[in-house]
Amino acid sequence: MSAHSMLCERIAIAKELIKRAESLSRSRKGGIEGGAKLCSKLKAELKFLQKVEAGKVAIKESHLQSTNLTHLRAIVESAENLEEVVSVLHVFGYTDTLGEKQTLVVDVVANGGHTWVKAIGRKAEALHNIWLGRGQYGDKSIIEQAEDFLQASHQQPVQYSNPHIIFAFYNSVSSPMAEKLKEMGISVRGDIVAVNALLDHPEELQPSESESDDEGPELLQVTRVDRENILASVAFPTEIKVDVCKRVNLDITTLITYVSALSYGGCHFIFKEKVLTEQAEQERKEQVLPQLEAFMKDKELFACESAVKDFQSILDTLGGPGERERATVLIKRINVVPDQPSERALRLVASSKINSRSLTIFGTGDTLKAITMTANSGFVRAANNQGVKFSVFIHQPRALTESKEALATPLPKDYTTDSEH
């Protein structure tokens, strides 16, 4: 293939990938975090290729083959083949074995956060040679990168489970490397190809820690990745087993939402208070209670003493008879436990969004290894900004409104949600 036709092909691929990346971002309600970053990287690649085409930049033909496009294409294809993609090119912070702070880029975070994917576009030969110590200075082998992924994933539990790691190879992987990754607990996706060995004992091919760099060329002479000899083709796992957390911690905002008259049909009013009218409108568009019930189903419910005490106090002041009655039934379903905030929750610095009450409630959920249900997204974001990521289920808020209905204006019987637009 001539340099010009290769360039035209690369430009066509870049344009197609931009469309696919934009489509991916639209496929999830609220978009995919990092989707814009992926699109901008692809657009930068296209711009560069168009400059080459226009003769503004001169590059070698070999450089055309090794553009970032291969890796970006692998990311797009991975994201297209996975369920519940929440982010792409996500940067996670972690502490390495020496106690140094490091960052790790995860190409695709899928399965609601439970799966981390590294998409690899490099050829099996190059990857295998780097592993044998024959790469360029500073090249990190896939196995070393896998160790980083494991280290980081153990420090970033999702609902108290470590994310499952998949290394997705789009230009094959050698059989010994695939085996090593599997031993480490990492899933492999892609074509697994043979390594032709000229030794009687293939295990001698794997360099030990005591082997010096001088022995590298000898190793290279006795191993050859045979990409024609595909031993297995492994697709992405269709069902990744996730240990579903069966414990739920209820925040005050959730307790209120669960018993609110708004959640039980009392949303056809225009209230004196603007915020209540807005919540009623939200409820008419999207009911919250079915979402709460679905998440709470078959789970053990907890609430800390502070949350229940404050909830009762709010209920005594603002609650209507129906709301109080529902609260009595709800509290009977809940295990009320003493306040026991976790150590990492107590390390949070107080701010306008982080008060002692929220800290106690979320911290107790953390100690219980429970998912905290909440409408308090401000606290969750503020804690996240301080490096503390709580396991949460966030929903829309609903206030206690039953006692406000007497002064509210009922909506006409024929009023529909469409009338609001």
UniProtKB/Swiss-Prot annotation:
| InterPro entries in alphabetical order | DUF1308, DUF5614
Domain of life where this protein originates:
Eukaryota
| PANTHER family xrefs | UNCHARACTERIZED DUF1308, UPF0415 PROTEIN C7ORF25
Family of this protein:
Belongs to the UPF0415 family.
Q: What is this protein called?
A: UPF0415 protein C7orf25
